[in-house]
């Protein structure tokens, strides 16, 4: 049976700012963009969260919810440096580390001899080391599979941990709300509720064939999760699957010519980022993103073998014409999906 730990730093960016300036500790703060420039919140501390401030929320909305909120611009170079230090701490216990972002990672400690092989004690020691060396707190979840470890890490936040041992998995899952499963968002929660499914126990009683017919591939994934199945390994060589660039505008745009100028600028940035990963600019798909002044988001993409500016412009113009409906546009983004390395390798093999 595997022993998986999910380490999740507590309000990471904000925690670093509070560490470096103790006067911020007991007031609501957030790291994010300027409200005048249509900024977005990256993270908020717990005093701010009590007012309803959340990540990915517009800074303007956050300030409406919490007028006294102090919004800091963020120091990404420092956050990356701290993240590297955290990774060094994790690597003392296992080489099987899968970073998910700067502030969270999975560890497989199944074969670790540290702390007598106890995943619970390893997680405690990691969290203590992070605090001793960086004066930051982390939460942890311990379980036999990845998705349960991730769910568990959220249960005793902040600065806590939760263990789901193998003999408690079945009971834990039975009462688990479907909204707690990673990948089940608000739209899917409503769709499942319309099908009479609200907990994992409900899905366990559902015919898997019918579920797949109704939900496609995700139906099988959901059925597996509701039975405690997650075969995904902790992957230290996790590869980037996509690259994107986007810009939130200080003022809404209403003219296609304005959008064209922005896409020209974004394309140069996307091309530069992609060339660092794929010098030949080969991709699997490319697409565009538009967010309107009512915050509705639309994304369009299609299969394309190479990064292609003209194709992106055509796709964007088609989306602009068919989806905008007179609304202003507050965000424009471009993205590419990279080729699966295994598929790419197979395509290069000789017959």
From Swiss-Prot:
GO CC terms, sorted: cytosol
GO biological process: DNA-templated DNA replication; error-prone translesion synthesis; SOS response
Site entry: Substrate discrimination: 13
Co-factor binding comment: Binds 2 magnesium ions per subunit.
Keywords per UniProt: Cytoplasm, DNA damage, DNA repair, DNA replication, DNA-binding, DNA-directed DNA polymerase, Magnesium, Metal-binding, Mutator protein, Nucleotidyltransferase, Transferase
Quaternary structure annotation from Swiss-Prot or TrEMBL: Monomer.
Protein name, entry field: DNA polymerase IV
Source organism: Photorhabdus laumondii subsp. laumondii (strain DSM 15139 / CIP 105565 / TT01) (Photorhabdus luminescens subsp. laumondii)
């Amino acid at each position: 049976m595997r022993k998986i730990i999910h380490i999740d730093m507590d309000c990471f960016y904000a925690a670093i700012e509070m560490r470096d300036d103790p006067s911020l500790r007991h007031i609501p703060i957030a790291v994010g963009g300027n409200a005048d420039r249509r900024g977005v919140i990256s993270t908020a501390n717990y005093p701010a969260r009590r007012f309803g401030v959340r990540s990915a929320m517009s800074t303007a909305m956050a300030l409406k919810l919490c007028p006294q909120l102090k919004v800091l611009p963020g120091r990404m170079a420092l956050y990356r440096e701290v993240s590297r230090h955290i990774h060094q701490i994790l690597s003392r216990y296992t080489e099987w580390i899968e970073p998910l972002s700067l502030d969270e990672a999975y560890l497989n400690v199944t074969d670790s001899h540290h702390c007598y092989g106890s995943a619970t004690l390893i997680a405690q020691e990691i969290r203590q080391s992070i605090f001793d060396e960086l004066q930051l707190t982390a939460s942890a979840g311990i379980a036999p599979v990845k998705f349960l470890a991730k769910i568990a890490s959220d249960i005793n936040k902040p600065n806590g941990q939760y263990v789901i041992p193998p003999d408690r998995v079945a009971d834990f899952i039975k009462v688990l709300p479907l909204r707690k499963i990673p990948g089940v968002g608000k739209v899917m929660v409503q769709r499942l509720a319309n099908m009479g499914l609200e907990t994992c126990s409900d899905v366990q009683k559902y015919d898997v064939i019918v579920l797949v017919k109704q939900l496609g591939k995700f139906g099988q994934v959901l059925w597996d999760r509701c039975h405690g199945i997650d075969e995904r390994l902790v992957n230290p060589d996790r590869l980037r699957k996509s690259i994107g660039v986007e810009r939130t505008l200080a003022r809404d745009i209403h003219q296609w010519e304005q959008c064209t100028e922005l896409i020209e600028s974004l394309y140069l940035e996307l091309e530069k980022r992609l060339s660092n990963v794929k010098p030949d600019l080969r991709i699997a798909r490319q697409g565009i993103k538009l967010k309107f002044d009512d915050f509705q988001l639309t994304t369009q993409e299609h299969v394309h073998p190479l990064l292609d500016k003209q194709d992106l412009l055509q796709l964007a113009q088609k989306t602009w014409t068919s989806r905008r409906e007179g609304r202003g546009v507050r965000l424009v983004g471009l993205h590419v999906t990279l080729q699966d390395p295994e598929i790419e390798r197979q395509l290069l093999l000789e017959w």
